[in-house]
């Protein structure tokens, strides 16, 4: 799921795959050909997170910016 937070909505490249059971929140940029697995949480609620082209975030990983 993609969630807006404090006026920031994640930007996801068309060629990226975000699993329906993943959570992407706030100030997040997901590049091309990126894979976000089930249970992953990418929380850009207090700062920007950039997942660059070709990267992957595997199952149940958390990426959080304070």
Per-segment meaning from a language model:
Residues 2-9:
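A detector for short, charged/polar N-terminal pre-domain segments
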């Amino acid at each position: 799921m993609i969630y807006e937070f404090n006026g920031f909505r994640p930007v996801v490249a068309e060629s990226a795959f975000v699993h329906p059971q993943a959570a992407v929140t706030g100030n997040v940029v997901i590049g091309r050909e990126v894979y976000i697995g089930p249970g992953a949480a990418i929380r850009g609620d207090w700062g920007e997170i950039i997942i660059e082209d070709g990267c992957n975030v595997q199952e149940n990983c958390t990426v959080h910016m304070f």
